[in-house]
Curated annotation (Swiss-Prot):
The gene is Slc17a9. It is a multi-pass membrane protein. The lineage of its organism: Eukaryota, Metazoa, Chordata, Craniata, Vertebrata. This is Voltage-gated purine nucleotide uniporter SLC17A9. It comes from Mus musculus. Residues 1-26 are annotated as: Disordered. It holds the Pfam family MFS_1. One of its GO terms (biological process) is ADP transport.
Length: 447
């Protein structure tokens, strides 16, 4: 691996022109910079999920206000993924070209504004279902670029030996955001109505975006990137990434399949768990089931990153560690999801839900980092392809779950669906997954 990296970092001929932002992308963060950006991106991921989870948390109250049935609620919940799946590849490509941090800032500013204005859209007229579906599609479009841009950013700025912990730390923001919206959002929901939850999550996102713009990004680089986007010009010289070679590799398709399955199973649980607890245990407190599983998932995510990097530093093969993380993230989590569908005890349901969500965070140190192992020069683009597949599966999975609940009246089939999807992804990755780079060509240039 060191020899491969050194061959990639040979001086580029002077005739190859690069913009200042592209030149900056060729350098790694120093340790203080890495720590600062890790904290900022952790908060950014937290706010991403605050906005994303707002609708699932408010679905029951909004269904009562607007008279939705399960199928209509499923349409609104799944519409997020209709937009989410369309911008994954674009987000990864833009991250590789203009810098992931700039893509993240621009998208956060936009989705924060949409989230704040969602309650206004709901009361524009009698077509509330159409307006809210439209706002969720827009939110999905804007959030779809986040993780591919993040993957591109970390693959360029973070040392390989530190990627798992950095990514799992930033990824823990998904649990923190769900926790914040589940806890604070539940209180706001009870005290101030569902509209206040949207104002809360959207407002915090706009404050975060202002801070990043004001204190962390170079204004000239941001203006330059916007100019390139407006003119449709490439920020860097086109690279010779062997796309045909890339997509002929079984390891690439194994990574895509595993990411698809992990994303789909996670999206189903994320969208329907609040409704499951509300209907199955109507006397339980909303803040309990909206908080506890995600609270326990935070240390689980951090632990997975720590143990992953530790095992690699002790000499274990990279692919062995990645597959072990997927056994935990897809295999073990699916067992607890199955148990969740066969209990009538609130306490046991909380334990099973917490375990299932907690073990799913091990995917951050498994398949999410494996994509960076395979193709660090175009990790954003490749992750975008994989996450597009996951988002498309999420649309089908969330809609299908709503249909199954409505027609069968049972939640058991939903958790069986989660287990089937998870184990399909696990089996594919165990058989075909690898960690060797597949993006190398004789004259390779970083994107």
């Amino acid at each position: 691996m060191p020899s491969q990296r050194s061959s990639l970092m040979q001086p580029i001929p002077e005739e190859t022109r690069k913009t200042p932002s592209a030149a900056a992308e060729d350098t790694r963060w120093s340790r203080p910079e890495c720590q600062a950006w890790t904290g900022i991106l952790l908060l950014g991921t937290c706010l991403l999920y605050c906005a994303r989870v707002t609708m699932p948390v408010c679905t029951v109250a909004m269904s009562q206000d607007f008279g939705w049935n399960k199928k209509e609620a499923g349409i609104v919940l799944s519409s997020f993924f209709w937009g989410y799946c369309l911008t994954q590849v674009v987000g990864g490509h833009l991250g590789d070209r203009i810098g992931g941090e700039k893509v993240i800032l621009l998208s956060a500013s936009a989705w924060g504004f949409i989230t704040v204005t969602t309650p206004l859209l709901a009361h524009l007229g009698s077509g509330h279902l159409a307006f809210l579906t439209f706002s969720r599609i827009l939110t999905g479009l804007l959030q779809g670029v986040y993780f591919p841009a993040l993957t591109s950013l970390l693959s360029q700025k973070v040392q390989e030996s530190e990627r798992a912990f950095t990514y799992s730390t930033v990824g823990a923001g998904s649990q923190v955001g769900t926790l914040v919206t589940g806890g604070v959002g539940s209180v706001l929901l009870d005290q101030c109505g569902w509209q206040s939850v949207f104002y809360f999550s959207g407002g915090l996102t706009l404050l975060w975006a202002y801070y990043v713009y004001r204190y962390l990004l170079n204004e000239k680089d941001l203006v330059l990137a916007l100019g390139f986007l407006a003119q449709g010009l490439p920020v860097t010289k086109p690279s010779k990434v062997p796309w045909r070679q890339l997509f002929r590799k079984a390891s690439v398709w194994a990574a895509i399949c595993s990411q698809l399955c992990s994303a789909c199973s996670f999206f189903i649980l994320l969208s329907w768990l609040p409704t499951f607890f509300k209907e199955t245990f109507p006397n339980s407190k909303g803040w309990v089931f909206n908080v506890v599983p995600w609270m326990l998932a935070i240390p689980a995510s951090l632990f997975s990153g720590f143990i992953s990097d530790r095992l690699i530093s002790q000499g274990y093969r990279v692919i062995t560690v990645r597959k072990f993380m997927q056994v935990m993230g897809l295999g073990l989590s699916s067992i607890f999801a199955l148990c969740l569908g066969h209990t009538t005890s609130f306490l046991k349901a909380m334990i099973f839900a917490s375990a299932s969500i907690g073990f799913q965070t091990f995917n951050h140190s498994g398949i999410s980092v494996n994509i960076q192992d395979l193709a660090p020069s175009c990790a954003g683009f490749l992750f975008g392809v994989a996450n597009t597949a996951g988002a498309l599966a999420g649309v089908v999975g969330v809609c299908l779950s709503g249909y199954l609940i409505e027609t069968t009246g049972s939640w058991t089939c939903v958790f069986h669906l989660v287990a089937i999807i998870s184990n399909l992804g696990l089996g594919t990755f165990l058989v075909f997954g690898k960690a060797q780079r597949v993006d190398l060509v004789p004259t390779h240039e970083d994107l």
